[in-house]
Design a protein with these regions (language model features):
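Active-site catalytic motif of lipid deacylating hydrolases and related acyltransferases
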Residues: 1-21
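Conserved serine/cysteine hydrolase catalytic core
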Residues: 7, 113-178, 186
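Alpha-helical elements of Rossmann-like donor-binding domains used by nucleotide-donor carbohydrate transfer enzymes
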Residues: 9-16, 37, 94, 107, ...
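Glycine-rich phosphate-binding loop signature in dinucleotide/nucleotide-binding domains
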Residues: 17-22, 42, 182-189
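Conserved alpha/beta-hydrolase fold motif
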Residues: 25-26, 48, 137
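Gly/Ala-rich beta-loop-alpha elbow adjacent to hydrolase catalytic centers
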Residues: 26-35
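Flexible "cap/lid" loop of the alpha/beta hydrolase fold
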Residues: 40-88, 119-120, 124, 148, ...
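Conserved alpha/beta-hydrolase catalytic His-Asp/Glu region
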Residues: 83-129
Length: 189
């Protein structure tokens, strides 16, 4: 029995909103895993910018790539078959330290989804078209150094900022400047 196509559905919705002119996908955190699904359906996608993100895991589920302790923890804290908002996955909410501005933090937290638990076990499309697109990596936090090193190994432009995972909210100008620089290195602005 196969459940909903989480990856294909997200890819189709993004492509429907963005196609019509050349565009770059900016993929943050777990959204990096959606690159194959987006690439499979987006006609005008010209490149990928990964921002403190996991790299694609085509043909595998998130649970096959994530630390087993994290996957087990998320299963324990799931209610009504939905994951809790990201900021509650931890012993204490990290957002006050990462987003000091109360209004910006409230806006961010207010938009955090409660994703279906089934998404964790959904298999990402096995396509490889994403690997043929120009790509770059922006590392914001040390937690994503392994991914940045892998991106560098692939020959992608990599930029490392010494900040934190949610810097696009608390330091948007700095992150935007780094993204613009990386986009230019791919030949897109």
């Amino acid at each position: 029995l196969q459940g909903p196509d989480w990856y294909g559905g997200v890819g189709a919705r993004i492509a429907a909103r963005c196609d019509g002119a050349p565009w770059l996908a900016v993929l943050h955190s777990g959204a990096g895993g959606f690159a194959p699904a987006i690439t499979d359906v987006a006609a005008d996608l010209v490149g990928l910018l990964f921002v403190d993100a996991v790299l694609p895991y085509p043909g595998r589920a998130w649970t096959q790539t994530a630390p087993s302790a994290l996957a087990a923890h998320l299963r324990r804290v799931t209610k009504d078959e939905r994951l809790p908002p990201w900021n509650t996955w931890f012993a204490s909410d990290p957002t006050p330290a990462l987003i000091p501005d109360a209004a910006a933090r409230a806006a961010f937290v207010g938009e955090l989804p409660r994703a279906p638990l089934a998404y964790l076990d959904a298999v990402s499309p096995a396509g490889t078209a994403w690997a043929r697109l120009p790509a770059a990596y922006l590392r914001l936090s040390p937690a994503y150094e392994d991914e940045a090193a892998e991106a560098q190994h692939r020959g992608w432009p990599v930029r490392r900022l010494e900040t934190h995972h949610l810097a696009m909210v608390s330091e948007p100008d700095m992150v935007a400047a780094a993204l613009s620089e990386l986009a230019a290195s791919l030949g897109s602005e």
